[in-house]
Amino acid sequence: MPNPERHGGKKDGSGGASGTLQPSSGGGSSNSRERHRLGSKHKRHKSKHSKDMGLVTPEAAPLGTVIKPLVEYDDISSDSDTFSDDLAFKVDRRENDERRGTDRSDRLHKHRHHQHRRTRDLLKTKQTEKEKNLEASSKSGSTKDRISGSSKRSNEENDDHGKAQISKSSNKESRSSKLHKEKTRKERELKSGHKDRSKSHRKRETPKSYKTVDSPKRRSRSPHRKWSDSPKQDDSPSGASYGQDYDLSPPRSHTSSNYDSYKKSPGSTSRRQSISPPYKEPSAYQSSTRSPSPYSRRQRSVSPYSRRRSSSYERSGSYSGRSPSPYGRRRSSSPFLSKRSLSRSPLPSRKSMKSRSRSPAYSRHSSSHSKKKRSGSRSRHSSISPVRLPLNSSLGAELSRKKKERAAAAAAAKMDGKESKGSPIFLPKKENSSVEAKDSGLEPKKLPRGVKLEKSAPDTELVNVTHLNTEVKNSLDTGKVKLDENSEKHPVLKDTKVQGTKDSKPVALKEEIVTPKETETSEKETLPPLPTVTSPPPLPTTTPPPQTPPLPPLPPLPAIPQQPPLPPPQPTFSQVLSSSTSTLPPSVHPRTSTLSSQANSQPSVQVSVKTQVSVTAAIPHLKTSTLPPLPLPPLLLGDDDMDSPKETLPSKPVKKEKEQRPRHLLTDLPLPPELPGGDPSPPDSPEPKAITPPQQPYKKRPKICCPRYGERRQTESDWGKRCVDKFDIIGIIGEGTYGQVYKAKDKDTGELVALKKVRLDNEKEGFPITAIREIKILRQLIHRSVVNMKEIVTDKQDALDFKKDKGAFYLVFEYMDHDLMGLLESGLVHFSEDHIKSFMKQLMEGLDYCHKKNFLHRDIKCSNILLNNSGQIKLADFGLARLYNSEESRPYTNKVITLWYRPPELLLGEERYTPAIDVWSCGCILGELFTKKPIFQANLELAQLELISRLCGSPCPAVWPDVIKLPYFNTMKPKKQYRRRLREEFSFFFLPWGALDLLDHMLTLDPSKRCTAEQTLQSDFLKDVELSKMDPPDLPHWQDCHELWSKKRRRQRQSGVLVEEPPPPKASRKETISGTSAEPVKNSSPAPPQPAPGKVEPGAGDAIGLGDITQQLNQSELAVLLNLLQSQTDLSIPQMAQLLNIHSNPEMQQQLEALNQSISALTAATSQQQDSEPTAPEESLKEIAPAPAVQPSAEQTTPEASSTPADMQNMLAVLLSQLMKTQEPAGNLEENNSDKNSGPQGPRRTPTMPQEEAAGKQTGHESH
């Protein structure tokens, strides 16, 4: 609808107001000349426009060509960073553009009217003549524009308003035309009544708007403008938002190209021309604004944020833009808002795209957008450097003063020129309002340029809805302020476009209403005095209700409320306020009349509205720079407005809805400012809301992270939240690769836990990878046979930089009393077949669970299999575990698994191994449970492979086809070929057939033929095991048997030092005897007698005491001791005979070794107790009849007696002789039992020492 009107130059000429008609008549020749120039200069201007767009600052872009000088100033102050064009070059280009721009404006207007092409040829001569005049006037204006920026636009406006009078009152007309351009923007919005004038103005202004659009500075300042030039870009919210966000030369260049294309296309030029009439007003407005351009740019420096926001927000709807236009400026000051607006803008801008999608609207919008782009670009500049605002405002104040004077002269000239042009009432109003706006609104324009545009846009909406659309597009590109205006206008525009020119009045009213809200918001943000400043009391009266209620209720009144905001800025600019205030009442009345009579009073209303808007905008802008965060709420509103205006004509309600929606979006978004977003009533109290929202978002941000903590709490309660001081450390029970393991008690629950320390002081790369891997895997493994990690605690309450503080973390596990290695080495327990079945069943269930979860343990050994006193088995230490993918068959390191439990494929260099490696390790443990010793104990990989080959046969292709593929098959061959003897060897250990068969399958050389964990559970040995019916093993409750404890005892024994740990009395005695006896056993080589003497070195006093004790023992006590020895001794018949008949050192030592093996309690403190309490063993034996009690006493006696080889021999001889004499049958039984037990136990003890060494080496390999 608006497009055809815009395109119809005749319609515009005839239907336009008198002001517009006169310029068209007088400017017909000028338009034709401009067209001619456009034809010739379009190409030049494309390049120049691309340059000029970069050169022309946002001021020039929004305000018109007149703004270019200001743009120069602003470019230096705020836009220099964003726009790289030189100021001098910009000035020259601006001058050229102004000269050409006036011609272009006329040409473009005619192009838009489609008469442009036809009249080009006819008017070429006229245009050339008029162009000369215009050039002369534009030159003078451009010079003035350079000086004040107002004369430049006055020339452009002169061209737009009347080329005949342009030469006379180029300066006056430039100012009036600037005001007129702003009015024309309103007229565009009010296009229905103002179509003719706007079209003629467009023709005249098109060059200006074109210049502004093409001016490199404008483009550079407002990438949105560039985007706006291209309808797609303008429409695309992303494009606008991008432009706002990125004031980049590339967008500018693109814009320039778009502009050039528009210039080239007559249709596009005509559209832009139709848009340019609003530009005209902005041109005059810009000329006045030019003087305040520093302020406007400064405000824009704040507005840049608003601009960015407004770009997206305004695109969707200018409602939010207007009401928040001051806010938008303030928003512009807040970068968060601008970003948010961008994020939101895409949807609204897309909606605006719909209206823009109409090609005529697009082109017109693009040209009006170029104007708005100018203002938007200024706001962008502010967004680029909001800090520059104050500097610009101070400089701008001086410039505005000078420009005010120029504006006054230009306004007078404009009034005269415009009156002569044929719209004396409209133009004088424009001149008065524009002059006053310039005087009072120069600074305001700078700050509230977006607001002014909004206000002017409503008037233009009345004049031309299509212009509104173009303006909306332009405003989207221009800046957030303009975007806000456009967003408000744009919803109306869409509706009006659909409705038609008739609807333009309501649309204009709506837009005006939106603008009043924005004005109100800006006023509220600014200060209560602003409304007071508003000179027109009637307007405030009308204004207050619109301001208080949401946008919808204020359709007509908003225009008035805009006026009240105007006066408050006026006080800020006292000079400008005085002139604009006087003009404001008429302008307010004209605006009201505009609402009532759209066509006739639209021009005057536009002028007055522009003046009001400028004043109001100026006030918000000043406040905006003061309150950068406040703009955020309006942007939110703008977003809301953008969405709903597109959807529905009622811009005010839509704004609220959209504001709410943006809030949700903002809440979702990480941007803190948007979250609060003044959703409840941004128009009423935008400042507080704007301030509050940023706080809310910050509060909400931690909440965003809360779910993660919540997830942790769900799976693991408060991991990492507690400190290790919540536990009472009882003692060290183990040592890991990255720290110690402590037994501790939870102070809160009294529960026993194991704290695995993760040290960070030795880590070069932070948290140890093994700990990370273990934590990650254990959190995924929940099984009764897998150790449970309860939580993670820190060693410092504040948990600051642990790396710097050499702090540590602690993995909190459920406490297990023993590990299998400690139990087997302690000799305190003898596992029955049922116990072995239970242990293996639980172990294989846990391993099968891990394998089914695709995890390889890769470190199964006795020390990593934990037991509690109830006989429950748990698989622990997942530091080497990793996720296994059977499909990818990727290589893994083969330096895993302790050497004694390492399968042959790893020894031969296999890197693509399978879960079968864990099954081999479990097979080794099964054999160890029966033999009481590791079955493969070697210290080197080659030796380990040799031991495996002796028992399981040499690896060869016959039994293992793939072995030849392994890297070390040729280098690590056994010394000779061995046959498999596993069943034969283990048959001596009286293994059950089921266990032997299972062991044979688990220790198969070929991993592909090795049974799986699931198959082991189905074996005859384990399938019928019912754990619930199993009796718990008789484990030592008085002593926790862990690897560390057993290693300590072993080292002490090897060094000849008695165990120093003081266990309970019983435990200590047992440990003492077993310690002395076990030490010789471990150290003893094939010739046990030799090692024993060296190891047993108690004091002579002790030996004597023991001798006395043994003599004091009665036969009953000896019988008890004999019974104990019968059940747990490894003595053989020949040994007993030797002891009885021959008292040689070797035999005595052998007996001592046998006793040590049979008695399996070792304690570090036995030596102390032995010295201090030589008689204690005796008493304990007497008091305690059970075998365990007697056993400790015997153990203690043995170490005491073994002070020297002679003493030991004597003591043993006496003891054994007495025992044998008194109880020969018992001795026979003892010998028989020893025969049975000696086989398995003797071998187990022997490898203990190598086992430890190998373990140490293996650990080193694992760590690598």
Curated annotation (Swiss-Prot):
Biased composition range(s): Pro residues: 528-571, 670-685
Polar residues bias spans: 252-276, 590-600, 1073-1085, 1163-1173, 1193-1207
PTM sites of type Phosphoserine: 236, 249, 265, 274, 276, 301, 303, 310, 312, 318, 323, 325, 332-334, 338, 341, 343, 345, 383, 385, 400, 420, 423, 614, 644, 681, 685, 889, 1055, 1085
Catalytic activity line of the entry: [DNA-directed RNA polymerase] + ATP = phospho-[DNA-directed RNA polymerase] + ADP + H(+); L-seryl-[protein] + ATP = O-phospho-L-seryl-[protein] + ADP + H(+); L-threonyl-[protein] + ATP = O-phospho-L-threonyl-[protein] + ADP + H(+)
Cross-link (Glycyl lysine isopeptide (Lys-Gly) (interchain with G-Cter in SUMO2)): K263, K510, K655
A cellular component annotation (GO) from this entry: nuclear cyclin-dependent protein kinase holoenzyme complex
Keyword line: ATP-binding, Isopeptide bond, Kinase, mRNA processing, mRNA splicing, Nucleotide-binding, Nucleus, Phosphoprotein, Serine/threonine-protein kinase, Transferase, Ubl conjugation
Domain Protein kinase residue range list: 727-1022
Region ranges (Disordered): 1-455, 471-611, 623-703, 1052-1103, 1163-1264
List of catalytic residues: D859 (proton acceptor)
Compartment list: Nucleus; Nucleus speckle
Low complexity bias locations: 287-305, 313-350, 576-586, 601-611
The record's account of how the chain is modified after translation: Phosphorylation at Thr-893 increases kinase activity.
Stated role: Cyclin-dependent kinase that phosphorylates the C-terminal domain (CTD) of the large subunit of RNA polymerase II (POLR2A), thereby acting as a key regulator of transcription elongation. Regulates the expression of genes involved in DNA repair and is required for the maintenance of genomic stability. Preferentially phosphorylates 'Ser-5' in CTD repeats that are already phosphorylated at 'Ser-7', but can also phosphorylate 'Ser-2'. Required for RNA splicing, possibly by phosphorylating SRSF1/SF2.
Quaternary structure annotation from Swiss-Prot or TrEMBL: Interacts with CCNL1 and CCNL2.
UniProt xrefs under PANTHER family: CELL DIVISION PROTEIN KINASE (PTHR24056), CYCLIN-DEPENDENT KINASE 12 (PTHR24056:SF126)
Family statement drawn from the similarity comment of this UniProt entry: Belongs to the protein kinase superfamily. CMGC Ser/Thr protein kinase family. CDC2/CDKX subfamily.
Protein name: Cyclin-dependent kinase 12
